[in-house]
Amino acid sequence: GGAMASGCAGVTPSGYPPLDELLPGGGWSRRGLIELLLQQNGIGEMRLLLPALQRLAGQRIALLQPPHLPQLSGLRARGLPPERMLWIRASRLSDVLWSAEQVLRNGSCGALLLWQGAVRTEALRRLHMAAQASDMLCWVLRPLAMADAPSPAPLRLALRPHPEGLQIGRAH
């Protein structure tokens, strides 16, 4: 869809109005890195991103270094056909980062999710610059322990498990 379908230009609604109120521009920015700092993997981060991913009607979604492959039947049930998913795994960090940059630069996907622990600030800056020029959703999912590490990401959110779902706070 065009700018009409996705609300404010350069922003995709999160699907959660209370979260949109907290997010700059009223949704997930498609102009730069969004860093999600997770207390642990599998606490509901994919459920959080699902409404935004569902809005990418027909576009591919790149998943780099996912900690585990999501259930394909579960994806299909949530309106995300597995054939739209691009799984990328690499053993060397340099290859992971290169792949992420290529995805951002070639514009063939609507979203990129990168799971990564320690990354040099310079490498994150390169990704951020590529993401700024991409008009794609670009989430980097890292351990909460990285909250104190320098990051060029304009938006850094800390995600912790909560009895009612997720506790989301800004990480600085």
What does each model-identified segment do?
Residues 1-63, 77, 82:
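Detector for small/aliphatic-rich hydrophobic stretches
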Residues 55, 103, 130:
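Hydrophobic/aromatic ligand-binding patch that stacks against planar heteroaromatic rings
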Residues 62-119, 124-127:
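Long, charge-dense
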Residues 71-75, 145-160:
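Glycine-rich, charge-decorated loop segments at or immediately adjacent to ligand/cofactor-binding or catalytic sites
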Residues 81-83, 107-109, 134-137, 152-155, ...:
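Short glycine-/polar-rich loops that comprise or flank the Walker A/P-loop
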Residues 115-117, 140-143, 161:
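Short, structured patches in soluble enzyme cores that scaffold and shape functional sites
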Residues 121-145:
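Conserved P-loop NTPase nucleotide-binding/switch module
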Residues 171-172:
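Conserved small/polar residues in nucleotide/adenosyl-binding loops
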